[in-house]
Curated annotation (Swiss-Prot):
<keyword id="KW-0732">Signal</keyword>
<keyword id="KW-0165">Cleavage on pair of basic residues</keyword>
<keyword id="KW-0964">Secreted</keyword>
<dbReference type="GO" id="GO:0031841">
    <property type="term" value="F:neuropeptide Y receptor binding"/>
</dbReference>
<feature type="modified residue" description="Tyrosine amide">
    <location>
        <position position="64"/>
    </location>
</feature>
<keyword id="KW-0968">Cytoplasmic vesicle</keyword>
<dbReference type="GO" id="GO:0005615">
    <property type="term" value="C:extracellular space"/>
</dbReference>
<dbReference type="GO" id="GO:0098992">
    <property type="term" value="C:neuronal dense core vesicle"/>
</dbReference>
<protein>
    <recommendedName>
        <fullName>Pro-neuropeptide Y</fullName>
    </recommendedName>
</protein>
<dbReference type="GO" id="GO:0005184">
    <property type="term" value="F:neuropeptide hormone activity"/>
</dbReference>
<dbReference type="GO" id="GO:0007218">
    <property type="term" value="P:neuropeptide signaling pathway"/>
</dbReference>
<dbReference type="InterPro" id="IPR001955">
    <property type="entry name" value="Pancreatic_hormone-like"/>
</dbReference>
<keyword id="KW-0027">Amidation</keyword>
<dbReference type="GO" id="GO:0007631">
    <property type="term" value="P:feeding behavior"/>
</dbReference>
<dbReference type="Pfam" id="PF00159">
    <property type="entry name" value="Hormone_3"/>
</dbReference>
<keyword id="KW-0527">Neuropeptide</keyword>
<comment type="function">
    <text>NPY is implicated in the control of feeding and in secretion of gonadotrophin-release hormone.</text>
</comment>
């Protein structure tokens, strides 16, 4: 009975933590502006196109600060193309004798 209760409590905790994580990811990007419709006045269409342009600029902008996260720093170190790290063949070195 005690083990069954622990199992259900751990499943409930896992489900709640997953819901919290999904809620966090949902707010990552701004929401797309609502289309006022085909027969909307010119001012509403101008506001919509301005909001849409702002939305597209936010979504497609370059994020310069994202490269400094620890994961990307490690991948840069591991996958960096550096001539010193590339192994050379013995035939490129001058003969020793």
């Amino acid at each position: 009975m005690q083990g069954n209760m622990r199992l259900w409590m751990s499943v409930l905790t896992l489900c709640l933590s997953m819901l919290i994580c999904l809620g966090t990811f949902a707010e990552a990007y701004p929401s797309k502006p609502d289309n006022p419709g085909e027969d909307a006045p010119a001012e509403d269409m101008a506001k919509y196109y301005s909001a849409l342009r702002h939305y597209i600029n936010l979504i497609t902008r370059q994020r310069y600060g994202k490269r400094s996260s620890p994961e990307t720093m490690l991948s840069d170190v591991w996958w960096r193309e550096n001539t010193e790290n590339i192994p050379r063949s013995r035939f490129e070195d001058p003969p020793m004798w």
